[in-house]
UniProtKB/Swiss-Prot annotation:
Molecular function as annotated in GO: methionyl-tRNA formyltransferase activity
Alphabetical list of SUPFAM superfamilies matching this protein: FMT C-terminal domain-like, Formyltransferase
EC number: 2.1.2.9
InterPro entries: Fmt, Formyl_trans_C, Formyl_trans_C_sf, Formyl_transf_N, Formyl_transf_N_sf, Formyl_transferase-like_C_sf, GART_AS, Met-tRNA-FMT_C
Family the entry assigns: Belongs to the Fmt family.
Name this polypeptide is given: Methionyl-tRNA formyltransferase
UniProt xrefs under Gene3D superfamilies: Formyl transferase, C-terminal domain, Formyl transferase, N-terminal domain
Superkingdom of origin organism: Bacteria
Chain sites annotated for binding (6S)-5,6,7,8-tetrahydrofolate: S111, L112, L113, P114
GO cellular component: cytosol
Keywords for the protein's UniProt record, in alphabetical order: Protein biosynthesis, Transferase
Function: Attaches a formyl group to the free amino group of methionyl-tRNA(fMet). The formyl group appears to play a dual role in the initiator identity of N-formylmethionyl-tRNA by promoting its recognition by IF2 and preventing the misappropriation of this tRNA by the elongation apparatus.
Catalytic activity, as annotated: L-methionyl-tRNA(fMet) + (6R)-10-formyltetrahydrofolate = N-formyl-L-methionyl-tRNA(fMet) + (6S)-5,6,7,8-tetrahydrofolate + H(+)
Length: 320
């Protein structure tokens, strides 16, 4: 029976781990994941989604601070894996780790490589308004998402997709793809297709400050940004309320062709939400927002409670 050590941390890899664990043709001697970390305002120490999944299936969990240390390498060698399957782990694997398995190391990546190598391929696909994206399983090498392609599959990006919804669908696709990849390896029919580096692009790790909305941009571009940054870091603007500049997070909008005003100007407030003008033409109807220190709510309720006036310009440095 093929021995597969699964290496991952985030929930993108959960469906893949579940699929391998439930497939009787493979055994998982261990799951390697990042150390438990404090999360949220309460700083409660919470195990990773991969650790929780592993424990549910009674799989031994190994949580090294550094997977490339001599001790970690020795521990993984002791497991005698045929394959490493890596997904959303959070550490770069050294050549010494990649050489441990008898067959090789596979990585499940949320894009159609060589497009969007790096940390944020799902957000990049939405921000760039791509019509399709997908998942690629590669044979790992020492580069960042540069290994030979074993298998890939695509799906359509919906105009309403957020990073959360697209993440979920790609994770499910990844699970189907890793099982097909393992089957191909078992049958001795697993290809190694070199990536075309001339077509490579990179999706760097997202920083919170990137989520500040520039209202001079096109309404479609702003809409894509809002969807790409939901649920994290969440697109935001600023609004002056009672003489104070506050941060307003924006979760959901509807593209409008009828907004006329300067970029960021509130041109209409009604039960449907807050209509804000964008650059070039048209605007966005804000539907779900969250003022700093408050709960997420319908934009109409926020406008009423904050006494937001038509003509207010969002994103202004100084009060009007």
């Amino acid at each position: 029976m093929m021995r597969v050590v699964f290496i991952g941390t985030g929930d993108f890899g959960v469906p893949s781990l579940e699929a391998i664990a439930l497939d009787g043709r493979y055994t998982i001697p261990a799951v390697v994941t990042q150390a438990d970390k404090p999360l949220g305002r309460q700083k409660e120490v919470i195990p990773s989604p991969i650790k929780r999944t592993a424990l549910k299936h009674h799989i031994w969990v190994f949580q090294p601070e550094n997977i490339n240390s001599a001790g970690s390498i020795q521990q993984i060698q002791f497991l005698k894996p045929d394959l490493l399957v890596v997904c959303d782990y959070g550490q770069i694997l050294s050549k010494a780790v990649l050489e441990i398995p008898s067959i090789g190391a596979l990585n499940i990546h949320g894009s159609l490589l060589p497009k969007y190598r790096g940390a944020s391929p799902i957000q990049a696909a939405i921000m760039n308004r791509d019509k399709e994206t997908g998942v690629t399983v590669i044979w790992m090498d020492e580069g960042i998402d540069t290994g030979d392609i074993l298998m890939s599959d695509k799906l359509l990006v919906r105009s309403t997709d957020t990073a959360e919804t697209l993440h979920h669908r790609l994770a499910e696709l990844g699970a189907r793809l890793i099982i097909q990849s393992l089957e191909a390896i078992r049958a001795g029919k697993a290809p190694r297709i070199p990536q075309n580096n001339a077509l490579a692009s990179y999706a760097k790790k997202i920083k919170k400050e990137q989520a500040l909305i520039d209202w001079t941009k096109d309404r479609h571009e702003i809409d894509a940004m809002i969807r790409a940054f939901n649920p994290w870091p969440v697109a935001f603007t600023t609004v002056w309320i009672g003489g104070e500049k506050k941060i307003l997070k924006i979760f959901k909008v509807i593209i409008s062709h009828r907004a006329k005003g300067m970029p960021g100007e509130v041109v209409r407030i009604d039960r449907h939400g807050i209509l804000v003008a964008a650059g070039r033409s048209g605007g966005l109807l804000l539907r779900e927002v969250q003022l700093e220190g408050r709960k997420r709510m319908h934009a109409a309720d926020f406008a009423r409670g904050a006494r937001l006036a038509i003509g207010t310009v969002l994103g202004q440095k100084d009060e009007q």
